[in-house]
């Protein structure tokens, strides 16, 4: 068996080896720091046994994927601590996220004093140093297990899985959770953590479901890294746009108007007008032509474009398909509208590329628990562009789009740490 490491070097073994055994074979220091392995691109437990040729990367908390495993384990320690102190709490889900981790519980809200007590209990659990073990059950046995423990949310998750599925569990001491993993080998690996806040969240993000209590936390490999992160969070609070925007009289919100529907104050209108003129001028320089399309359309348009099937739950729908002859919806995006601008005329291939630009007001029915300031709202204005191009023009036009985005971000001073997502 030949194992190819991240640096291209190779290790040859006569028999199967676990990821942690290979880590020790590389160096004891690496093994002590290891959080997980990445085998042929898949993140796995350190206890995973490798029995065939593969590419292997040993992940530590310095790696984004390794840190995610550490934080996922921290969420399990959190859940164990909560159920130790609050035995009636029902567990839902507890993933790692970009900034840390969270876990959702069906129980009354937690106070800051509660969070402090939970932190202390987590430290006790970590000090005991229980090993983390993975095991599996059949779908039927897994459902019976959580029914006996009166954990309805776990039962629901398992029931959504196909019949015949093998269900994985992770246990630490006498506490067990449903989980696909991976996790650290011991709770001792959670060395530096902090519970940050508690809030409400709907089960599975739907307002039709039960309201749960969510605890947010973060975790790092060292106390110094945690301290640095917490200091950055405090600085971010001081610079929070939601706070500064109100202080500078740029925008405000009013309960009677509704969540995610900000009032733009005169100072904010001036800023928006300046930004709009600037970006439209930049687009014009680059050959964009302006369009102005309706704020709503019949459901037929969204069915043709495919948005109805995929985004209907996130749209503001006017009317009832069962009783009304026509059903309308406020637009969540502009693309199908600008496509019909193109279709309104005949075009030659010589007319291409056609670059349509529009400053669009869009509407999206966001969950109330997801909204904050201007970062997640139900009505917003963006600069949108859609291009009709020939195949031989695609590469250049794509590069020009990225160049425009980079230029705008650079002018606004936010060009660093930008990630581009293609959909």
Predicted regions and their residues:
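Extended, charged alpha-beta segments that form solvent-exposed binding/catalytic grooves
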Residues: 362-423
